[in-house]
Amino acid sequence: MEQGYGGYGAWSAGPTNTQGAYGTGVASWQGYENYNYYGAQNTSVTTGASYSYGPASWETTKASDSLGAGGPAVHMASYGPEPCTDNSDSLIAKINQRLDMMSKEGGRGGSSGGGEGMQDRESSFRFQSYESYDSRSCLPEHHPYRPSYSYDYDFDPMPDRNGGFSSQYGDCRDPARERGSLDGFMRGRGQGQGQGRFQDRSNPSTFMRSDPFMPPSASSEPLSAPWPELNYVGGRGLGGPSPSRPPPSLFSQSMAPDFGVMGMQGAGGYDNSVPYGCGRSQTRMRDRPRRRGFDRCGPDGMGRKRKQLQIYDEPDAKLARADSEGDFSENDDGAADFRSGDEEFRGEDEFFDPGRQRGEKDDEDDEVKKRREKQRRRDRMRDRAADRIQFACSVCKFRSFEDEEIQKHLQSKFHKETLRFISTKLPDKTVEFLQEYIVNRNKKIEKRRQELMEKESTKPKPDPFKGIGQEHFFKKIEAAHCLACDMLIPAQHQLLQRHLHSVDHNHNRRLAAEQFKKTSLHVARSVLNNRHIVKMLEKYLKGEDPFTSEAVDPEIEGDDTLGGEKEETPEEVAAEVLAEVITAAVRAVDGEGAPAPEGSDTPPEGQGPVDTAEATHSPHSEQLVEVETPCGAAPEKGDANAEAGGETTEAAGEEQEVVAKTDGAVDGTVRGAAPAPPVTETKAEQTEAEPKDVTPTE
């Protein structure tokens, strides 16, 4: 028997049941021959002291026979599913080094197994009564908090990942063991920290206590022996090694794992393989997140930690790695642990960055709104220009660029049913006028289209497929658009028939037909409320032909019809009245030489229609009236007014040709008014006051 390392005794590697004396006659250790610290032995050696340690085998009957209250021997559970042939001295030296790590912490020896002189708190980790694997059979009433479920395992906890250690979850811990453990855990007592770590992290109630890194009690941990305190995997690492490989912790090169804040290990305790690590199931390890510090317990942080945990756990559950690989993975896991924290805080900084730039985003939103408004105006003008050359049935909301299609529609059953529905709400004569009006309007649109085609026939049409190559896999096809279902269907007979006979289409088309009928009545009334069409209707009811009269420009009539689909706003009505008043005033000034209403001056002699010929055909010619107003916001309102009442402005195009002649008169008229009233109010005042002084010229 060789001398112990540092006074603790050495471990003999003899082929037989050798004993290593602990200190000077303290107790003999057994069962570590041939690196077989699981080997069951049947020899009890007693030294000079009264502390004798006999073995307790896996068979509970033997352990029960030799265990009793006040017995001379305190049994130690020795476990050995298979012998190991590695008999090297390096293993013994490593074991002694780990014993020395414990001696540096406490420096005190001696403990009482039978109740004599518990002088050392630290030694309580090493010398206590050890239960057999089945704690119920050998110690029926040993501890009131002993777990109530069995450990049915045959030396290999692989079928159940928890092995014999599932009792650690939520069990009561022994205060005697916990009292002297905090300082050892804070100092890094070898690789035994993994035991306390798994206990604390598996039980959330123990995390924020004053002793957060206590190892579990003997009752909740039937395999807690002095050996588990020396290896990194903890007491649960001895549950039953896999026959395929030795325990990795015995060959670990790192004597103390890395520590983070408050003594928490940065190295990955969860990275160990299951039978040697903590024995916890992978699902339980994922269910509870890691806690790297007291300031990282938020739900978001937990979610990130759990994801990080899965990355490093799953390979260990599937692959049997070498010991050196296990060590490197522990360090790597710790590095990844802190890297994940940095990424977490970086993500939080990025999350709060938008809050710091809200002012800039508000400005960007304003710019985006302005751009969108401009785009809407351009789209409106483009649509208006397209409507001038597009065939349309206003009451049915049918539009087409093909003459044949509009003719078919006017003779279709749908169009006739729509007019029949309108005739139930409006007089028959009015409905007939609507039909005649729609037909005549489309004739005028056809003439306009022919003129435009002659002018623009030389211009090549843009190809929408220009720049689209075969790599985009585009193909030009014909398709049908189902307005009721809002769906595009390729123009193939099978697909079209399938859609036409589908239940959804038949349901949607009935709803659409009802909706179109209701809308058609509203549109018809709006069209008939237009002042130009009202005059035409009066002539039609008198028996005259309103469509042959050239009093209204055909182009304007078409625009009026399009505008009739929506009711006129008060601004549009005011603009129309103002245009009429100005026209009457101009005629009075030019024809009779009378002063313009409200003291307006005569126009300059040099000013005439030629000078403003270009402005005559402008769609915003109404701005000529309002541009001289002293109010700074008047021109902008004039723009909006001109857009809102653009159709009416075009309707009064002939009358407004003479507006340019009386710029001075209009200027005087507006300047004589009250300063800076709203544009509509100014128009209303002029509407009320001016007709009194106007001499009718008709």
Curated annotation (Swiss-Prot):
Post-translational modification: Phosphorylated on tyrosine residues probably by SRC subfamily protein kinases; multiple phosphorylation is leading to dissociation from nuclear structures implicated in chromatin structural changes.
Zinc fingers (C2H2 AKAP95-type) by residue: 393-415, 482-505
UniProt feature, compositional bias: Gly residues: 108-117
Motif (Bipartite nuclear localization signal): 290-307
Signal peptide: none
Stretches the record annotates as Required for interaction with MYCBP: 576-593
Biased composition (Low complexity): 641-651
Pfam families: AKAP95
Sequence motif: Nuclear localization signal, positions: 369-378
Main subcellular localisation: nucleus
Residue numbers of Phosphoserine PTMs: 111, 202, 324, 329, 340
Biased composition (Basic and acidic residues): 171-181, 315-324, 682-698
UniProt keyword list: Cytoplasm, DNA-binding, Immunity, Innate immunity, Isopeptide bond, Metal-binding, Methylation, Nucleus, Phosphoprotein, Protein transport, Repeat, Transcription, Transcription regulation, Transport, Ubl conjugation, Zinc, Zinc-finger
Region (Disordered): 102-123, 161-223, 269-383, 546-570, 591-698
Protein's cellular compartments: Nucleus matrix; Nucleus, Nucleolus; Cytoplasm
Top-level taxon in the UniProt lineage: Eukaryota
Compositional bias per record (Acidic residues), positions renumbered to this chain: 325-335, 552-570
Region (Involved in chromatin-binding): 388-451
Family: Belongs to the AKAP95 family.
Protein name per its UniProtKB record: A-kinase anchor protein 8
Gene responsible for this protein: AKAP8
